[in-house]
Amino acid sequence: MAYLEELLEPFESTVLGTLGSNGYPFSSYAPFYYDGEVVYIFISDIATHAKNIQVTPKASAFFIEDESITENIFRRKRISLQCDAKKIDRESEQFAPIMQNFQEKFEGGTLTMLMGMKDFNLYALTPIYGEATFGFGEAYNIGGEKMNQLVTRTGDSGHK
């Protein structure tokens, strides 16, 4: 059984989909850290996707294989997670360990600099359902107790 943690390992950023106040979807991207259950993003409150999450605490996180890796554009590996979103307060006991993991993943000073900026905040994106596609006819739902496993499709898309 494949787990999301292995599948998301090569990715450093996720494409975010959020819902704007005008009712239209908005796409952007953000670096992320995944702990095996939750996708964490550290984004500025000035950014449109942060404002959207604050109003409608839901987001999609989309991960897609680089185009240069495959010979057939239609066979790109991709994972789409539909998530509930929640801001993690800087004062919470979760904040420091998650940010430490972020720093280890992205070895460099940029994240340290951003941590000092008060408009940047940590958000937890908790998957409630998702899909993974690895080529023609190789599609799975995301499921399991912690919503972190590939589950063979049975004809039901798993959407709520």
Stretch-by-stretch model annotation:
Residues 1-54, 62:
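An N-terminal domain-cap segment
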Residues 13-14, 59, 108, 112:
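A general structural signal for well-ordered secondary-structure junctions
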Residues 19-21, 28, 68-71, 109-114:
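Catalytic micro-motifs at enzyme active sites that drive phosphoryl/nucleotidyl and oxygen chemistry
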Residues 27-31, 80-82, 120-124, 139:
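Conserved hydrophobic/aromatic beta-strand scaffold that supports enzyme active sites
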Residues 38, 58, 129-131:
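Structural motif
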Residues 44, 64, 135-137:
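Surface loops and adjacent helix of pleckstrin homology
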Residues 48-105, 120, 127:
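Short, structured beta-strand-loop surface elements
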Residues 100-101, 105, 109-160:
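C-terminal edge-of-domain segments
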